[in-house]
């Protein structure tokens, strides 16, 4: 998981813990937290997180020994971290599903990286997001994608509503934080369960009835 610009990983704690309760090992890098982050370096750190899990899975003395499904990695992130998770997924075939939150354009371009991704993509966005508007970010990423893709837009959802608390330069929405986080967790869990656990009962939860 990649954090947003100038945000602490701890502001996503409840969502990361939610995923853990559904059987996922969740790892989040706290790098590139300053005012001049390098997005490619952030993507590289996301990939290093996967390598760390692989290494721990192979060490007999590790608490993770033999516990990690190293062929079933998913990637996620919020804002800058969402964009960097796109870069990481486009560059690392170990990632089998991508689901991010209000992903922001990056340098190098996350939008331009979308055609290189060949795994399922979920671009969760908020209709009231004034920091990373869905029309110029999530929609552009969706349009550029050639993979199975979905763009769930949380009505009334806002940029900082994906976090446990407001951080630097936050906006506001028309739904509560609790409502937005509940819907975010529902979407994330259903998507990852479908594509990483192959739980076909989640098909309609992700794609609807058609």
For every predicted segment, state its role.
Residues 1-4, 102, 125-126:
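The conserved beta1-alpha1 loop
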Residues 1-38, 130-133:
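Short substrate-entry loop that stabilizes the transition state in hydrolases
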Residues 38-83, 201:
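Gly/Ser-rich "nucleophile elbow"/oxyanion-hole loop immediately N-terminal to the catalytic nucleophile
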Residues 94-105:
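A conserved short beta-strand
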Residues 117, 123-125, 129:
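Short beta-strand/loop motif that positions the catalytic acidic residue
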Residues 128-132, 159-160:
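Acidic catalytic loop of the alpha/beta-hydrolase fold
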Residues 132-143:
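Short alpha-helix in the alpha/beta-hydrolase fold that links the catalytic acid
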Residues 147, 156-158, 164-210:
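Alpha/beta-hydrolase-fold serine-hydrolase catalytic core, especially in secreted/extracellular enzymes
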């Amino acid at each position: 998981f990649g954090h947003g610009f100038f945000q602490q990983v701890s502001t996503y704690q409840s969502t990361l813990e939610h995923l853990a309760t559904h059987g996922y090992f969740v790892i989040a890098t706290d790098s590139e937290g300053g005012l001049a982050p390098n997005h490619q370096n952030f993507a590289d750190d996301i990939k290093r997180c996967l390598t760390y899990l692989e290494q721990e899975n192979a060490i007999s003395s590790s608490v993770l020994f033999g516990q990690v499904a190293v062929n079933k990695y998913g990637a996620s992130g919020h804002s800058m971290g969402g964009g960097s998770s796109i870069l990481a997924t486009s560059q690392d075939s170990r990632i089998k599903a991508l689901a991010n939150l209000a992903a922001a354009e990056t340098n190098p371009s996350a939008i331009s990286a979308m055609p290189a991704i060949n795994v399922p993509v979920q671009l969760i966005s908020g209709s009231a997001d004034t920091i990373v508007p869905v029309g110029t970010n999530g929609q552009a990423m969706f349009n550029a994608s050639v993979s199975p893709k979905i763009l769930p837009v949380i009505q009334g959802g806002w940029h900082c509503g994906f976090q446990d608390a407001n951080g630097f330069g936050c906006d506001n929405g028309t739904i509560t934080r609790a409502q937005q986080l509940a819907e975010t967790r529902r979407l994330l869990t259903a998507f990852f369960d479908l594509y990483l656990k192959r739980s076909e009962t989640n098909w309609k939860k992700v794609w609807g009835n058609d």
